[in-house]
Regions:
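Terminal, non-globular segments
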Residues: 1-161
Length: 161
């Protein structure tokens, strides 16, 4: 495992908390928890990625009052699938990284939408096409900037590298 990936993920988590909790920016800020999870999940085992996703999700859930555990479930599933993606997809091209980040964020929003319950969720077209699509695009652009600056998600992949 590369230390750089873990350092960048830790900084993304810290930045997420500062922006969302410290400054109270809310939905106008990118989802850096998901970005941090996607960066680290390609480097670790499925159980560790799911556990990290669950932990980050509980931190996210602690900031809100409704549907406690829905963020934890969503990030745990995304972390587990992202860790498995290392065995299914090999590559570090710009197209792959952009697709990986976009689909990871969109899947997180989809699982959250399903887990939150019908009483609290918006209509599917609004939530999954408009809101989740724009949020995934926003996080992908921020993620690509992080990739270019730090070099994470590039180079040799795998648990043994």
């Amino acid at each position: 495992m590369r230390i750089l990936d873990w350092v960048v993920a830790g900084l993304l988590v810290l930045l997420h908390l500062v922006i969302h909790v410290g400054f109270g920016v809310g939905a106008a800020a990118p989802d850096l928890f998901t970005l941090a999870l996607l960066v680290v999940a390609r480097e670790c085992h499925m159980a560790l990625a799911a556990g990290l996703g669950w932990t980050l999700g509980l931190l996210e859930d602690a900031q809100g009052l409704l549907a406690f555990g829905a963020h934890g479930l969503a990030l745990a599933i995304v972390g587990a699938l992202a860790a498995r993606s290392r065995e299914l997809f090999v590559g570090d091209s710009l197209l792959f990284v952009a697709s990986y980040l976009f689909l990871g964020k969109w899947l997180r929003d989809f699982v959250y939408w399903v887990a939150v319950g019908s009483g609290f969720r918006p209509p599917p077209v609004e939530a999954l096409v408009v809101d989740a699509g724009l949020a995934a695009l926003y996080m992908t652009l921020v993620g690509l900037a992080v990739v270019f600056v730090t070099g994470v998600l590039q180079g040799p992949r795998g648990v043994g590298s």
